[in-house]
């Protein structure tokens, strides 16, 4: 490999500015390459356009065979790939190994979803048959995030390739190495030249990509970026947009019993991945009584026990660093500006890099808090007087990605399920729960009604209805109002 770009089956050095990727745990530079120029972005899209007809014409079985080889490559490379992800993101090795498992598992889940949701179905008709088929859109641009730099773009790329689309992939500028390793695995699996292309860079490269004649944009990231893309493509109804955005996710605890058991679910909802999951709980809503206070105390106590440290340190951590020193500085500033009573302060962590922060807990009861996603381990607590107030507080957001209820009362769950506005709703499970066999997406500022995961098949192909008779028959008698 002689460069950080992969265009038309060839690795090449970029003509843009130099870029680096830094291990947030140590500050060490672990990747250094030149980014893509506008001309190279255009070349990547042209390569994908040129490769599209032949790839789309391949049989389903041929495309499946390539993707199953890709799965095998991922399995074989799990150890080295997971370590690279841990170095680039700071995430614990148990997390990055799980991420590799999800990437490999995506292949079979996508095959099943494609056949179930976008396969071919026929019905007999008096004249012959009516057939539903699905066709690939063409060239898909995939913009990846930093928090799951393998799994989340993989969740777009695999179903797109399976459907017959070709792809130009731009990873997050925070995690270029992860994107490179993903494309290397596809290359080893035998994906034909031009079917997958990789361009590296920041916002200017992303802008150059969406300015091209693409057929779809598959994006995972912030609500602000999603709003920008909607405006950008307002006059391009031909471009399929699949936007998986953030959340200001509520977790309601009501009549839940053991505070320690409840606290374990809350911590796994709010502080896993150092709060850098779009489905992390940001708002904890509890009863304003002794039971609610016991839950709050249990969360604060359990938070003190969480191991915060490097992925390759002496003790396995629950939390690693945030993605960068800059992200940590923004998180600390956001925590400081949060109104209310600080129950556990978010702070820097002594003896570790500036990217490490501790989990924070703030009681915001009675306060007006901006409806924003703070991508960090900071949990707001709000105490309310009734379960109906709890549901109202949970729904008091423009977002609608994930929500959860912790309760031993089935009646509460039934009520919560019918009233909550979210695309992922969990009962006595962390808000971060998801599965490749289910859709994943949200309402409001959290998406555009094109959920990913199992429903990714829907936005990777479009339906074609055909009405077919094998022979020409004389239908003259069917014409009404015909002169003799």
UniProtKB/Swiss-Prot annotation:
Keyword NAD set for record: yes
Catalytic activity: N-succinyl-L-glutamate 5-semialdehyde + NAD(+) + H2O = N-succinyl-L-glutamate + NADH + 2 H(+)
GO biological process, one term: arginine catabolic process to glutamate
Pathway: Amino-acid degradation; L-arginine degradation via AST pathway; L-glutamate and succinate from L-arginine: step 4/5
Active site: 244, 278
EC number(s) given by UniProt: 1.2.1.71
A GO term, aspect molecular function: succinylglutamate-semialdehyde dehydrogenase activity
Main enzyme class: oxidoreductase
Keywords: Arginine metabolism, NAD, Oxidoreductase
Residue numbers binding NAD(+): 221-226
Pfam families hit by this protein: Aldedh
Protein role: Catalyzes the NAD-dependent reduction of succinylglutamate semialdehyde into succinylglutamate.
Family under the similarity heading: Belongs to the aldehyde dehydrogenase family. AstD subfamily.
Protein known as: N-succinylglutamate 5-semialdehyde dehydrogenase
Organism in which the protein naturally occurs: Caulobacter sp. (strain K31)
